[in-house]
């Protein structure tokens, strides 16, 4: 067993970001040694055109797909796309579906929280698109759902969306 292999196994099994300190403790090495191992892994992935990559942000590291393989991954897993969407992304998607075209500011007003990440995720999955600019000051981007949105949810028109129950 190699140290690099151990890191890969831990990151794959975790399925989310892992603290570098946690890796260091598991491998019984220093955090600097872990960072060096991660650097070597990244170099190996690039050199061998691997479909996976590791992303290091501050004190955490996460295994992910290589960006250049994104299209094939999305194509192969399109039926499972909603399983990968966070609750926040699903909320934003519902808001856009029922209120399109809509600006990010309007989405955030409805949700009460920032929505940059969910919007970017939905754009990446091609479930929403930039559909123009509002005429309000600053001309913010308007978002709408895409044809892929309809396909993924098995509907042929937005008219098929269930009616929203009024809140009291």
Curated annotation (Swiss-Prot):
Cellular-component GO terms for this entry = cytoplasm
| Family listed | Belongs to the ScpB family.
Q: What does this protein do?
A: Participates in chromosomal partition during cell division. May act via the formation of a condensin-like complex containing Smc and ScpA that pull DNA away from mid-cell into both cell halves.
The subunit structure is:
Homodimer. Homodimerization may be required to stabilize the binding of ScpA to the Smc head domains. Component of a cohesin-like complex composed of ScpA, ScpB and the Smc homodimer, in which ScpA and ScpB bind to the head domain of Smc. The presence of the three proteins is required for the association of the complex with DNA.
Localization, per the record, is:
Cytoplasm
Q: What is this protein called?
A: Segregation and condensation protein B
* Any single GO BP term: DNA replication
Q: Where does it primarily localize? A: cytoplasm
């Amino acid at each position: 067993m190699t140290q690099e292999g151990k890191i890969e196994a831990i990151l794959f099994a975790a399925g989310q970001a892992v603290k570098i300190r946690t890796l260091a403790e598991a491998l019984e090495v220093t955090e600097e040694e872990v960072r060096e191992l991660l650097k070597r892994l990244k170099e190996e992935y690039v050199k061998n055109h691997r479909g996976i990559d590791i992303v290091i942000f501050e004190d955490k590291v996460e295994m992910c797909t290589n960006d250049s393989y994104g299209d094939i991954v999305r194509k192969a897993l399109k039926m499972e796309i909603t399983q990968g969407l966070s609750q926040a992304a699903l909320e934003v998607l519902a808001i856009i579906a029922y209120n399109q075209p809509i600006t990010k500011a309007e989405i955030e007003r409805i949700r009460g929280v920032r929505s940059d990440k969910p919007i970017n995720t939905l754009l990446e999955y091609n479930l929403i698109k930039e559909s123009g600019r509002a005429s309000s000051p600053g001309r913010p981007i308007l978002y709408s759902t895409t044809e892929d949105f309809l396909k993924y949810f098995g509907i042929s028109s937005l008219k098929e969306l269930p009616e929203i129950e009024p809140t009291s």
